[in-house]
Amino acid sequence: SLGRWWCFFTLILVTHPLLDSLTTYGTQLLWPLDAPPAAWPIVFIIDPFYTLPLLMALIIGSVSGKVRSACRTGLVISCAYLMMAAGAKWSVEQRLTPALAEADLQAAPVLIQPTPFNIALWRATVIDEDRYYESLISVFDRDRVPALEPLRRNVELEASALEGPLGQRLTWFTGPFLRFETRYINGQETLVATDIRLGFPGFHPFSFTLATREGNRWVPVAISEEVRSPRGVHLATLARLAARAGGDVSALCASDYVEPQWRAEPFLYRC
């Protein structure tokens, strides 16, 4: 009927952006208004535990002929998973609060998001001017104050990086969650900004050129280029991630894979 077709397409158009808003990057719910993306990250961008119940429901429904009941069951399971994710994030926020108070970072920008492919292990990123802090918190951790591991942002490069329109657009999208560095690209000193939200410390996939050095000043680029990360994730890394998600604090620290030049206090590590 026309009513069912209307519901079908309306729910697709409404629920898809709402689900996107539950990830780290979020989505522009108010588009075409030029408002920053709305993001309440409680699930990773790719989470098999959310997707598989829906996929299995379609397969079972197609085989058994009971499409409606199978899809209803799959949807209930996936929605219950989102509710569990919201509860897990709330628990992590409560555990992180004492650590922020101890470091006098209560007013600092904080991003709490699940690590890849699960809702048991969460990553907290805290911005504090010239440095930022990373922390891993599992819902299975015992009563312990999370460790905040300090890393460099190279904030002295921030003004030059964000001077041009491309830099302004990038910070509109990322907020303060950027770090900066200089690299030689095609023989030219180039200012590069990295989005530290997605991925994992040491494995950030998105970096962009924003300015080049001409004489004694930085000149914003006309066209920004993505700079690919040479590092990949190995199975051993995922195994350590899984062990840390289970509550083994010694299995993985937030800064274990971070290159030495980003460590703000090299001798204070090992969570």
Question: Where are the language model's segments positioned?
Answer:
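Functional transmembrane or membrane-interface alpha-helices that line membrane-embedded catalytic
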Residues: 1-67, 103-106, 111-113
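Short, basic/low-complexity N-terminal boundary segments at the transition from targeting/disordered tails
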Residues: 12, 98-102, 161-162
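Active-site environment of divalent metal-dependent phosphoester hydrolases
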Residues: 19-21, 88-92, 118-119
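Internal/C-terminal transmembrane anchor helices
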Residues: 65-92
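A short glycine-/small-residue-rich loop at the edge of a beta-strand within enzyme catalytic domains
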Residues: 83, 87, 112-115, 167-168
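Alpha-helical transmembrane signal-anchor/signal-peptide segments
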Residues: 89-108
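Extracytosolic and intramembrane catalytic regions of membrane-associated proteins
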Residues: 108, 121-123, 127-271
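Short, conserved, surface-exposed binding loops centered on an aromatic residue
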Residues: 114-116, 125-126
